[in-house]
Amino acid sequence: MLFRSTSVESIACYLIGITSLILFVIFENKMKDEAILPLRLFKDKTFSLIAVVGVITGAGMFGGLAMLPLYLQIVGGSSPTNAGLELLPLTLGIMTGSIISGRVISKTGKYKIFPVIGTILLTATLFLMTTFNADTKYWWIAILSYLFGVGLGHVLQPTVIAVQNAVAKRDLGVATSSVTLFRQLGATVGTAAFISVLFGRVGNETQAAFQNSVTNPEYQKALMDPNNVSTVQQLQALQTGQATFDDTSWLASANRTLIHPILEGFANSMSHVFLIGA
């Protein structure tokens, strides 16, 4: 179930989150060195910087990661299994980035440049993903997925190394796990925000795409085809508000010409999300 960002349910979640954060800080401060996350670690500039970078990159990269399989399934028409297989270039990119950064760091001992390179690459790739539309070819998606993975590979491990070199030996465990914590916090917030933006825009984007399709002869021909009755009924239900985009499974078997405005609406909305992520 989806709620508007200004709904009572959403505001209640905001308040609960803020209250929980305040209570967490209070109790962690009281526990001193026995705290799960000792607040004294934030006095170290490197640790504080990595914490901020972790939240920001976590939001961007995991928000982007959440969009790719959605794009492949909704716009590309792939099954969940095929969408997972089509993301293999992303995994290969992560492996490549991790291996390259790892080998260079082991030989030179220098690691600070890799998070910078990785962040730049992630930003550039997310920006290029704004070119995705309803007719984007898979080879372009695969290339950008690979580059996105390379960027991730340059960020994930070097940031851990940076923190480990900045803190005292007794804090290695908590500092290392904190990197993952900040990244996951960013991922949680980023994914929720990006999904909200996506479904907040998709209605207007789809409506605009339908209006542009009215004069398309192929669309009108498909609209009058008796074989497309079920698709037409589903489209009418969407336009009258009797159906929502919560369930898009019917798109896989629908006439591609008729649902092209929906695919275009989703693609345009996702492009906006990628731009925010960049």
What residue ranges belong to the model's regions?
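A composition/secondary-structure signal for short, hydrophobic, low-basic-content segments
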Residues: 153, 160, 180, 229-230, ...
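Hydrophobic alpha-helical segments of secondary membrane carriers
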Residues: 53, 178-182
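Transmembrane core module of solute transporters
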Residues: 6-174, 190
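Hydrophobic transmembrane architecture of multi-pass small-molecule transporters
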Residues: 184-277
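Generic low-complexity, intrinsically disordered sequence content enriched
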Residues: 25, 69, 76, 176, ...
